């Protein structure tokens, strides 16, 4: 604890070294229906842009979340292997993941397939922590990861890239941006990734490979009928893995397509209409013990209307109302359990923002009408008060939910009488936000109820479990002309109702990322630490720390070279285990990336 106090005091001192007038802030969209500047945000948020991704060179999204944001992420091996993300000590299926604002979580067991997202085609990531169902709907108990593939620089150019790494890793990347007119822009990206992989269990000698083809596209058109934006992300391929030590493989397909129309009706209101569709498909290549080829397929279609700037209010820009309808179709076959079901959820939601006497008040609500369990109300209430010109104190409370997914309702042990899982949380945040430096010190407490688990007496799933978490988080972000710093320290106590530590979640974690421009190079050093964790069967996962270094060099305006040295100390570390074995992670390795911009 003394080390943590010293670090906090150091961070507070650093902010005074770079005190400047408050001018420009990042715009945050993940925690409210009303986009806000970062100095108006109470809830903890991490925002990663393309510049940060280029400097740190993460090999995949899982490693970025773990090593640069101190988030607990468990992996069943290397690139493309199953991974689980635990935000704020919640379960892995309590994290909502969106691509271009479109939900990609499956309606079956487990979380979203973030391991199929190519980090080289991501433009920015926003992560909101805590209960956010009032803004995003079901699943946002622990938080939301919102990933954008939209190009942040609207100019005509094209580029090709190549990457190589250990275990015969190779990637080819093509990007194309076209500015047709001042009011129309297109960007397209394509990547192909292949790796032979390595043995994913300590007792295995079998390499487990991965193939991925990803295509992204965004078309923006501004006209007299409003602004139109078409977004697309698709990924497909093959992944090899182990089941009880035996080699198997599966084909996968993910996509998220959306069409958005926004417009302002002068003197009346502004509106936004979103039409989206997404898919999460897994097809096994090896038959189960019944001789059947299992599959899970979630198809989700949604329609959303958001109305803002309604002139009936005194400050119309500070009020938002919306309606959302979602149709979810699931085709499921697993070890003899088969079903096809459709579920419809209708929601009505709203947000408001008030400011007076140096105090900001944010409120959000959502009433969801689920076809099975009927109505549920989620909400957030936040107060942010100025203490002086630089310091602000925020207090927030919220309630969020996760609807039981189709496999819990209709699968093995299914129960159509299940209720939604609930998280009620509160948070106190002390913030110092400047033009080039942000400091956040917060404490939080979460209580999870109605958690779904298997009742071995009645041999059915029931809402029978509870869990809680409380903790402290410190974030410090500094951006200067030739160097950047991001430091995150977390201490928490995730436990079930019997007091046992929740599986695969650490009590302490930290990340330190420093980038410096030096002699034409950009050098980035990353240090991360995770405390002890526990896995199934009481297996202990030891604490570990990692050191990574990335070097980037622009030889001219067209040619760029990057080198990533990962796990420099060659640590053996584990984030997941089986009943009698550990899943392995990448040892010391080097990753090389070349990018060349075509044309003039």
Give residue ranges: language-model regions.
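N-terminal periplasmic accessory domains that precede
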Residues: 61-64, 81-86, 98, 113-118, ...
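Extracytoplasmic beta-strand/coil segments of soluble accessory domains associated
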Residues: 62, 66-102, 106
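Outer-membrane beta-barrel signature, preferentially recognizing the C-terminal barrel domain
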Residues: 245-264, 298, 386, 391-392, ...
């Amino acid at each position: 604890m003394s080390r943590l106090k010293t670090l906090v005091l150091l961070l507070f001192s650093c902010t005074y070294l770079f005190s400047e007038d408050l001018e420009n802030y990042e715009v945050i969209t993940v925690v409210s229906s009303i986009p806000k500047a970062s100095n108006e945000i109470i809830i903890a948020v991490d925002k990663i842009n393309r510049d940060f991704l280029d400097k740190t060179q993460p090999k995949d999204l899982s490693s970025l979340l773990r090593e640069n944001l101190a988030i607990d992420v468990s992996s069943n091996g290397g690139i493309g292997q199953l991974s689980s993300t635990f935000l704020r000590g919640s379960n892995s299926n309590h994290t909502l993941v969106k691509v271009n604002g479109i939900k990609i979580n499956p309606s079956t067991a487990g979380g979203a397939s973030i391991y199929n997202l190519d980090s080289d085609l991501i433009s920015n990531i926003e992560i909101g922590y805590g209960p956010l169902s009032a803004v995003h709907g079901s699943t946002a108990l622990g938080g939301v990861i919102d990933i954008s593939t939209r190009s942040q620089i609207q100019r005509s150019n094209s580029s090709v890239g190549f990457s190589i790494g250990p275990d015969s890793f190779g990637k080819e990347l093509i990007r194309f941006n076209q500015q047709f007119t001042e009011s129309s822009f297109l960007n397209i990206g394509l990547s192909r990734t292949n790796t032979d992989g390595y043995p994913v269990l300590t007792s295995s000698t079998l390499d487990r490979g991965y193939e991925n083809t990803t295509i992204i596209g965004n078309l923006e058109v501004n006209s007299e009928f409003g602004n139109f934006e078409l977004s697309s992300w698709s990924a497909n391929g093959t992944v090899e893995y182990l089941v009880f030590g035996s080699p198997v493989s599966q084909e996968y397909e993910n996509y998220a397509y959306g069409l958005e129309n926004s417009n302002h009706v002068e003197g009346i209101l502004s509106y936004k209409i979103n039409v989206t569709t997404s898919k999460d498909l897994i097809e096994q290549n090896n038959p189960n013990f019944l001789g059947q080829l299992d599959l899970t397929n979630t198809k989700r279609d949604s329609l959303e209307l958001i109305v803002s700037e309604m002139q009936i209010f005194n400050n119309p820009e500070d009020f938002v109302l919306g309606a959302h309808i979602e149709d979810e179709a699931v085709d499921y076959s697993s070890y003899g359990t088969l079903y096809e079901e459709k579920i419809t959820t209708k929601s009505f939601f709203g947000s408001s923002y008030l400011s007076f006497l140096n105090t900001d008040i944010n409120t959000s609500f959502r009433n969801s009408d689920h076809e099975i369990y009927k109505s549920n109300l989620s909400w957030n209430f936040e107060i942010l008060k100025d203490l002086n010109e630089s310091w602000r104190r925020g207090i927030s409370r919220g309630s969020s939910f996760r609807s039981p997914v189709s496999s819990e309702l209709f699968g093995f042990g299914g129960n159509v009488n299940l209720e939604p899982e609930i998280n009620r949380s509160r948070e106190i945040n002390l913030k110092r936000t400047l033009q080039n430096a942000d400091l956040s010190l917060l404490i939080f407490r979460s209580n999870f109820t109605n958690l779904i688990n298997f009742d071995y007496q009645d041999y059915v799933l029931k809402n029978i479990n509870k869990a809680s978490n409380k903790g402290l988080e410190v974030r410090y972000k500094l951006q200067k002309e030739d160097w950047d710093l991001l430091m995150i320290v977390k201490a928490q106590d995730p436990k079930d109702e019997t007091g046992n530590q929740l599986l695969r979640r650490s009590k302490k974690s930290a990340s330190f990322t420093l980038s410096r421009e030096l002699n034409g190079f950009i050098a980035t050093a990353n240090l991360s630490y995770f405390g002890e964790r526990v896995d199934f069967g009481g297996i202990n996962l030891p604490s570990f720390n990692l050191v990574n270094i990335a070097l980037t060099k622009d030889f001219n305006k067209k040619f760029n070279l990057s080198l990533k040295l990962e796990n420099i100390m060659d640590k053996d570390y584990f984030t997941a285990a089986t009943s009698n074995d550990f899943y392995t992670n990448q040892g010391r390795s080097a990753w090389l990336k070349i990018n060349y911009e075509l044309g003039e």
